[in-house]
Regions:
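TPR-adjacent "capping" and linker segments in tetratricopeptide-repeat scaffold/adaptor proteins
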Residues: 2-18
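Conserved structural position within tetratricopeptide repeats
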Residues: 10, 41-44, 74-78, 110-114, ...
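Helix-start (N-cap) detector for alpha-helical repeat units in TPR-like alpha-solenoids
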Residues: 16, 50-51, 84-85, 120-121, ...
């Protein structure tokens, strides 16, 4: 039975709001199972609430239940097809190494970028997925777009250097890794990738 408020009217929406707040608190506290339970209770009242479906997907994603997360992102997107975050998060699930569905992830990031063109986060994820499927030049294009406005973003500089390494352009890659090391001398990842590029360049020279 839906409870009554002080005026005697039913509090259907208040019940959903209360359950949703409990779920969000559980999410914040790291208790995703409890969040899912509260979201399920809220969805019994409002089964087509896109926000509830989206938040349930987030909890499943945090639990590494990627198939379930994708299912609920899809349900949310059928109701609210303009949810930028749902496309990005669905893409993150698909591009997780355990899923290894980079082409499908690319479609999600492209949909997200149609909604918010040139968003740095979506561009970065698109670039990473392009690199993962061997489309290195397109990946570099994504990273370049970010670097136009964030020229000192070291993670993006590293990703561009890595894509250049994959293309066999080791001299250029090393220059990008050196740029990172100028900004962050203790960046171990840049050191490691630079050494790998140097080793690859030496192997190519000896062949």
């Amino acid at each position: 039975m839906v409870p009554l408020n002080r005026s005697g009217a039913t509090t259907r929406n208040d019940s959903v709001e209360s359950l949703h707040k409990k779920a969000l608190k559980s999410q914040k506290d790291g208790n995703q199972e409890e969040a899912v339970l509260n979201l399920d209770r809220a969805l019994e009242i409002e089964p087509n609430n896109a926000e509830l479906l989206y938040d349930k997907a987030i909890s499943f994603q945090m639990l590494l239940r990627f198939d379930d997360a994708i299912e609920y992102y899809d349900k949310s997107l059928r109701i609210d097809p303009n949810n930028f975050g749902a496309f990005v998060n669905k893409g993150l699930c698909l591009s997780n190494p355990n899923m290894n569905r980079y082409e499908d992830a690319l479609e999600c990031f492209e949909q997200a970028l149609r909604l918010v063109p040139n968003d740095p986060g979506a561009l970065s994820l698109k670039g990473y997925s392009l690199d993962s499927v061997g489309r290195y030049r397109e990946a570099i294009d994504c990273f370049d777009k970010i670097l136009q406005t964030q020229p000192k973003e070291t993670n993006i500089i590293i990703n561009k250097g890595l894509a250049l390494s994959h293309l066999g352009k080791y001299d250029e890659a090393i220059a990008y890794f050196d740029t990172v090391l100028d900004y962050e001398p203790d960046n171990f990842f840049a050191m490691q990738l630079k050494q790998e590029a140097v080793n690859s360049m030496k192997r190519d020279f000896l062949q």
